[in-house]
Amino acid sequence: MSDLPQVVDADWLRARLGEPDLVIGDVRGPNAHTRGHISGSRPLVLGSPPPMSDPEVIEELAKEIGLRLRRHGVTGEERLVLYDRGDGVGAMPSAQLAELAGHPRVAVLVGGIAAWPDELDVGAVELEPVKVRLEPRLEALPTRAEVERRLGEPGLVLLDVRTEEEFHARGGYPCDPRQGHIPGAQRIDEEALFDGPGLPKAGAEVRAAVGAHEGAEVIAYCHSGSRSARATLALRAAGYQARNYPGSWHEWSRHAELPLER
């Protein structure tokens, strides 16, 4: 069984096209896939994580994602590489959802289809559903309960990738009942982790910005999980064991019992 990095580039994928244990999933949707896709890929829309992380919600989501994977012919025994239009906003959350459902080997193609140098295939791809049962990994998605339980835990980096104004409660979204940040979080602008849209900076630069050693555990959050999804792509590319907290401040701010700092 071949190893799979958390993030791969076009050269890595080109060298392995056609390998029998490699499945390439296009998360952009079936219409976009039909208009043009990486050779050998299939449409694989898994959706987005929910804004609330109640246990029953996460458990049901894991089952639903497992069903979607089976409908798209994904068994869990393959290496699964996901790509989007190029910014990571679609592929990175989809990767965490596949992990939540129990898929053990999932990667994201950095730069997505925009970075693919070869001619695209066109036309619809026929899917063959499979009958397998994945074992959910509920820990793949950080929840507000996990984040609260682990506040101040040595070795865990809690990374806020919002603006300085949001972090210090000098600005923010009016839909949030409270402003500030999760206690103990450090802040980095999401854009500081990238050289361009969907193109993470070199691993050494990202690690210098984060200030933690390669392999450290990082939970990233923002307002509603989009910026932190992109940040998670850069963090994983830099060698961190990174997860995106999809509920982010949108969820945390709604629970008056949860602490905050300004």
Listing of model-derived features with the role each one plays in the protein:
Residues C175, A238, H255-E261:
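Extended, aromatic/histidine-rich regions of cofactor-dependent oxidoreductases associated
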